[in-house]
């Protein structure tokens, strides 16, 4: 569980899918220049290599999970050609059920990590694979390969610049 008394995380990206599930409070999330306020009970997914930032002006508590794309590549065929999408405000009962199930999986992962009972890694990893299945089965969309590859190539060119900037 992430407890944030107030912070700003500037624009960045990483080679991981990031999920933020707000347990209490609110968080401003900007994804590729589109900002939205994430409220208690809402969940957002940020795809790998997508530029994003967060701003917390009031204390909040959230589950924040990053799944490295290299890990996902081992288990999800051609994951680099997929986007994971959902509308956190959907009124579609089937999608609401899928989102609620995913939130429950995230909550169970957090409980296993917080309590750490004997064999907790078995429990946590089984839930992680359940989450991967849910993402792949319920929320993935195939994208055109050239667009993904060009975007990744463009971002990889920026890596040395950002590394240099961070060091200096």
Description of each model-found segment:
Residues 25, 131-134:
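Hydrophobic alpha-helical transmembrane segments of multipass integral membrane proteins
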Residues 2-86, 115-122:
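N-terminal regulatory/effector-sensing and dimerization cores
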Residues 79-104:
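Aromatic/histidine-rich interaction motifs
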């Amino acid at each position: 569980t992430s407890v944030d008394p107030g912070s700003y995380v500037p624009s960045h990206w990483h080679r991981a899918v990031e999920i933020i599930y707000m347990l209490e409070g609110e968080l401003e999330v900007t994804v590729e220049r589109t900002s939205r306020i994430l409220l208690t009970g809402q969940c957002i997914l940020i795809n790998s290599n997508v530029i994003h930032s967060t701003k917390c002006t009031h204390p909040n508590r959230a589950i924040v999970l990053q799944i490295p794309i290299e890990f996902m590549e081992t288990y999800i065929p051609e994951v680099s050609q997929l986007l994971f999408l959902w509308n956190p405000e959907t009124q579609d009962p089937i999608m609401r059920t899928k989102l609620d199930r995913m939130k429950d999986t995230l909550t169970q992962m957090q409980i296993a990590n917080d309590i750490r009972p004997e064999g907790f890694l078995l429990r946590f990893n089984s839930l992680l694979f359940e989450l991967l299945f849910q993402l792949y089965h319920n929320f993935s969309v195939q994208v055109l390969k050239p667009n993904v590859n060009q975007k990744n190539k463009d971002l990889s060119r920026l890596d040395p610049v950002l590394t240099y900037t961070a060091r200096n």
